[in-house]
């Protein structure tokens, strides 16, 4: 039986493609760098933002500046260029009713994650939203989940992580949690299996079916 369920945000609860990729394009443009298409930037959805910029920029030198420029646009515009995946509210309502403790665990800065959860009126489903600090503290998913488990007083052996990228799965496993991967976000089935996901769900409703079986 699972006592607590942790959901990733980007690519699991909401589809943030437009807001994230447009804000990355804005930052790159401000840095006078080549600007890839939005589809070419979807690999950036999920992992810590700074690490994605380090990869794109080829080093650490301007990564912090790129993050700051990204947030110029994201904080005012990109945050809301986002949408909740179909059936997510149904899933959350059902799990809340079945007495599972629900949490958000995202590498996104908590100040933005909180605003997204409030904007889409998802607050009532979650006991707490755990995210990174603006300085990058706890952007690593393993560190974030360790912090969340401790602060929520959750036994990792009775907790489940739901996410769409490998770092969600790896972070959970490092903390002794079970982890389920979803295919409707931005990670591939191969990525999730290789990371060690215990189960793969193609749709949000499949997530509910799987979790309900664990709780019931």
Segment roles from a protein language model:
Residues 4, 140-170:
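Conserved Lys-Pro-Asp/Glu-containing loop-to-beta segment of HAD-superfamily phosphomonoesterases
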Residues 97-100, 152-156, 214-215:
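Glycine-rich phosphate-binding loop signature in dinucleotide/nucleotide-binding domains
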Residues 2-90:
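N-terminal helical cap/lid subdomain that shapes the substrate entry/recognition surface
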Residues 76-104, 110-114, 142:
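Short, acidic loop-to-helix structural element flanking the phosphoryl-transfer center
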Residues 161-199:
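Acidic, Mg2+-coordinating phosphoryl-transfer loop and its flanking beta/alpha structural elements
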Residues 34, 123-127, 155, 198:
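Conserved H-loop
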Residues 123-138:
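A short, structured active-site edge motif that brings together acidic residues
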